[in-house]
A protein has these predicted regions:
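Extracytoplasmic gate region of multi-pass secondary transporters
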Residues: 27-29, 216-264, 271
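Helix-loop-helix hairpin linking two adjacent transmembrane segments in secondary transporters
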Residues: 134, 139-196
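Extracytoplasmic
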Residues: 9-40, 125, 237-245
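Central cavity-lining transmembrane alpha-helices of secondary-active solute carriers
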Residues: 47-65, 264-276
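C-terminal ends and interior cores of transmembrane alpha-helices
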Residues: 81-99, 296-308
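Cytoplasmic helix-loop-helix junction between adjacent transmembrane helices
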Residues: 103, 107-145
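Intracellular juxtamembrane helix-capping segments at the cytosolic ends
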Residues: 119-133, 325-340
Length: 403
């Protein structure tokens, strides 16, 4: 077998690993189902996405150190094992004696999901660079597409499980965890049995101090905040879009599960944006494209705040999904280009910025709960306003994008 064919076959289990990376996006759909099952407030339900993304702050840089010690394949394998364990635990919540113990089991599960994803986000791209000598960008884009498939189907499976008249094994929306557990086991075994020759890693991994020192560079600091806003808007939309639809379009007796399709709509347009964006950026000025997609996101925020018709809200979800799909790659590349001699430090710092997914859902929950307490007709408007602050920051970032 030629080296080319061997490399392509080796990429298959790595792409399945990208699929397991998408498990993290089940957090939005699942937190909505949990809010109904456990009677949680908005701020309590939004704590779960925050819990997942908090671990990016803690584990991104240590993962770089770990890769130097045990290698990239073993690090990715570890991340899959942790992620698979995370989706395995909720299958046992029916054995917990109280609602409180069930809730604590979910806290542990979501923490492991965040830890596994933080390790994987940091380690899987370097692993791909060893397997692909040409067309690296297109390969990574395809990996993001595979990840987006998991993101896209997660809310659909959860909604189907919650509403089906013949619940499988009595799991309801938890059927999602069972299916993802099976995929996680396949990914673990396949990658574990796949032989990958790793090149020696020279130099030492970046430490926390090295990364934090890079914040002294204005463009890196601004990019770090930009990454936080991107992920915050991503996680926030994932969590709040069904609530906005229920609030504006729902009738008495409707539940969140009826509007879970909103999350899949978001990820469908995000997936579309990944592919078309990679093509458009080859022909269109990067700053111009960035301006267009951020303006799309701004228009989406207007729709979330003022929209009352179904088409207006669907359009808002589609616009923010498409617009936000390419923000990370552009902001990340701007930071990398600003300090090409410090790629490890910049990369670790940008991944740490993913903990923006912690901050936004918390403030969104606080805002909507406060609005409910004051008797507001549409309390989720204020959750959308929090996301709009992130979009406003990205608008201010436009002049920093190099032509």
């Amino acid at each position: 077998m030629s080296n080319s064919n061997s490399s392509k076959l080796t990429l298959i289990p790595v792409m399945i690993a990208f699929f397991t990376m998408g498990f993290v996006d089940l957090v939005g759909a699942v937190s909505n189902n949990m809010q109904e099952d456990f009677g949680l407030s908005d701020s309590a339900a939004n704590f779960f996405p925050s819990l997942v993304f908090f671990w990016f702050l803690i584990f991104s840089v240590p993962t770089g150190m770990l890769m130097n010690k045990i290698g990239r394949k073993k690090t990715v394998l570890l991340s899959i094992i942790v992620t698979t364990l995370a989706v395995f635990l909720p299958l046992f919540d029916s054995f917990m004696p109280t609602k409180e113990s069930q809730l604590w089991l979910m806290y542990i599960s979501f923490s492991l999901l965040g830890i596994g994803n933080a390790i994987m986000q940091t380690s899987i791209n370097p692993l791909v660079t060893m397997l692909v000598k040409g067309h690296l960008a297109s390969t990574l884009t395809f990996g993001q597409f595979v990840k987006a498939i998991a993101s896209f189907i997660a809310p659909l499976i959860a909604a189907w499980g919650a509403t089906t008249t013949a619940p499988i094994l009595g799991l309801s929306w938890r059927i999602l965890f069972l299916l993802f557990f099976v995929v996680g086991m396949i990914a673990t075994l396949w990658l574990g049995l796949t032989r990958i020759e790793e090149e020696p890693i020279e130099g030492k991994a970046s430490g926390f101090v090295d990364c934090l020192k890079m914040l002294g560079s204005p463009i890196i600091l601004l990019s770090f905040i930009g990454i936080m806003c991107h992920v915050g808007i991503d996680v926030g939309t994932n969590a709040v879009a069904p609530k906005i639809l229920l609030e504006r379009l729902g009738t008495d007796g409707d539940s969140l599960s009826k509007f879970e399709y909103a999350t899949s709509l978001y990820f469908a347009f995000r997936t579309l944006g990944c592919f078309t964006g990679s093509i458009i950026m080859r022909k269109l000025n990067i700053r111009t494209f960035f301006t267009i997609i951020v303006l799309m996101m701004a228009l989406a925020m207007v729709g979330f705040v003022f929209g009352t018709e179904q088409w207006e809200l669907w359009a808002a979800i589609a616009l923010v999904g498409y617009g936000n799909s390419n923000v990370f790659s552009i902001v990340f590349s701007q930071a990398m280009l600003s300090a090409p001699e410090k790629k490890n430090e910049v990369s670790g710092l940008m991944i740490m910025g993913l903990f923006g997914g912690t901050i936004f859902p918390l403030f969104m929950g606080f805002a909507s709960d406060a609005a409910k307490a004051s008797g507001a007709l549409y309390p989720q408007v204020w959750a959308a306003v929090v996301m709009a602050v992130g979009v406003a920051y990205l608008l201010s970032y436009i002049p920093k994008v190099k032509q």
